[in-house]
Every structure is written in structure tokens, then in C-alpha cells.
Curated annotation (Swiss-Prot):
Its EC number is 7.6.2.-. GO terms for molecular function: ATP binding; ATP hydrolysis activity; transmembrane transporter activity. Its main location: membrane. Pfam families: ABC_tran. Part of the ABC transporter complex LolCDE involved in the translocation of mature outer membrane-directed lipoproteins, from the inner membrane to the periplasmic chaperone, LolA. Responsible for the formation of the LolA-lipoprotein complex in an ATP-dependent manner. It comes from the Bacteria. Residues 7-228 form the ABC transporter domain. It comes from Mannheimia succiniciproducens (strain KCTC 0769BP / MBEL55E). This is Lipoprotein-releasing system ATP-binding protein LolD.
Length: 228
């Protein structure tokens, strides 16, 4: 896509149906994001933030509307094409790190590349590089239980970066962290954005964190609007 547009969506709606009750959680959402941009979506619990993020990342399908990554429609892609788009362009970070407890930090970061059948030696080198980039080169042999909350989230960020994504979608990445650790995670995001040109779209309830990003959007009752 031209003009540096990395991600955009047009007229997204999302309905959940329980019995005879239909609840619309996304209401005609239109949004775009440029290469290398840092964007925050803020809003109260239940406003539709996480649903939007999952839909933008192709993890959930909209009821209507369309999502484009680098001009390619997620809704028109086959399952194989969708997986390739996600693996090529996107990384994901969640509030709960979802690390595998029985594996070391290095093995956790390696996993997406091994699933993608990448060369094991090259994958290991890449994983070590990413752990070094997030400041954990000295902790690569530690399992999640031996890491602090901030360290576990750094491992999760490293895992999101191993396939060299253009965009990381982060759902409350600092939600379980104290203020000091939150600050360090934000500094890491800034550094990765500046050094590697990675764009970040953060869903967060932390207004202090959101204010530090390039752009802020507000989600309220399924409607996305610019910050006033």
C-alpha cells in the first residue's frame, strides 16, 4: 500500500449472539495506522478494545467490514494466506505473557520460528539477538518461574519480535506490572521503535502510558474516536 499505511480497517462491526440476544461490541470502526507509528487505544473494560485488537490481528473475524495489512485484505485471504500475513507483518503481546512454563526464555522465543520451520541454528541466533535487544541476554536459560513479572513480559516482547514484524499488537502489555516496570517496558518499546522501525498498537487503560505515544484513540461502547 502507498503512503506508508501499514494497517487500516473499514466499517468494522462485531456482534456476539447469545440465544435471542445480539450484542454489538464494535460499531462501524474505521481506522488506519502508518509505518513506524506508536498508537494507543484507551477505554474502560468492556468497551471493545481487545475485540478490536484481535480483529485487526486476524485472530477474530468481524461481522462486517474489512481489515487490510499493507493493502492485503484479511477477510479475502485463505487460511494459509492469513497465517502468512500474520507471520510476516504482525507480532502479538498480551497482558498475561502466555509463556510456556517448562521451557526456558530462549526456547519460548525460539518457538514461533521452529513452528515456521526455520533453520534451527539461524532461529537460535535470532532468538538470542532479540533477548539481547530486550536486555535479557543474561537470563536466556531461565524458565518463567525464575523471572520477574517485567522479565517475563520482556521475553514475551522478544517472542513477538523474532519474525521481524512491521507491527506489534499489544493488549494491556503493562497491565500486571508496577509503575517502575511499566516505565522500563515503555522505554523498551520506544527503543525498538527508534532502532528497528517497529510500529506498536497498544490497548491500555494506563493513561500515563498512552500520553507518551504518538497518537491516542478512545474506545467507548464499541465506537472508536480520536482523542479530543
Amino acid at each position: 500500500m502507498n503512503n506508508g499505511i501499514l494497517l487500516n480497517c473499514q466499517n468494522l462491526t462485531k456482534d456476539y449472539i447469545e440465544g435471542s440476544v445480539t450484542t454489538r461490541v464494535l460499531k462501524d470502526v474505521t481506522f488506519s495506522m502508518n509505518d513506524k507509528e506508536l498508537v494507543a487505544i484507551v477505554g474502560s473494560s468492556g468497551s471493545g478494545k481487545s475485540t478490536l485488537l484481535h480483529t485487526l490481528g486476524g485472530l477474530d473475524q468481524p461481522t462486517s467490514g474489512e481489515v487490510f495489512i499493507k493493502g492485503k485484505s484479511l477477510q479475502k485471504a485463505s487460511q494459509d494466506e492469513l497465517a502468512k500475513l500474520r507471520n510476516t507483518y504482525l507480532g502479538f503481546v498480551y497482558q498475561f505473557h502466555h509463556l510456556m512454563a517448562d521451557f526456558t526464555a530462549l526456547e519460548n522465543v525460539l518457538m514461533p520460528m521452529l513452528i515456521g520451520n526455520q533453520n534451527k541454528t539461524e532461529a537460535k541466533d535470532r532468538a538470542e539477538k532479540m533477548l539481547n535487544a530486550v536486555g535479557l541476554s543474561h537470563r536466556i536459560t531461565h524458565k518463567p518461574s525464575a523471572l520477574s513479572g517485567g522479565e517475563r513480559q520482556r521475553v514475551a516482547i522478544a517472542r513477538a519480535l523474532v519474525n521481524n514484524p512491521a507491527l506489534v499488537l499489544a493488549d494491556e502489555p503493562t497491565g500486571n506490572l508496577d509503575h517502575k516496570t511499566t516505565e522500563s517496558i515503555f522505554e523498551l518499546i520506544q527503543q525498538l521503535n527508534e532502532d528497528q522501525g517497529i510500529a506498536f498498537l497498544l490497548v491500555t487503560h494506563d493513561l500515563n502510558l498512552a500520553e507518551k505515544l504518538n497518537r491516542r484513540l478512545i474506545m467507548q461502547d464499541g465506537v472508536l474516536r480520536p482523542e479530543m
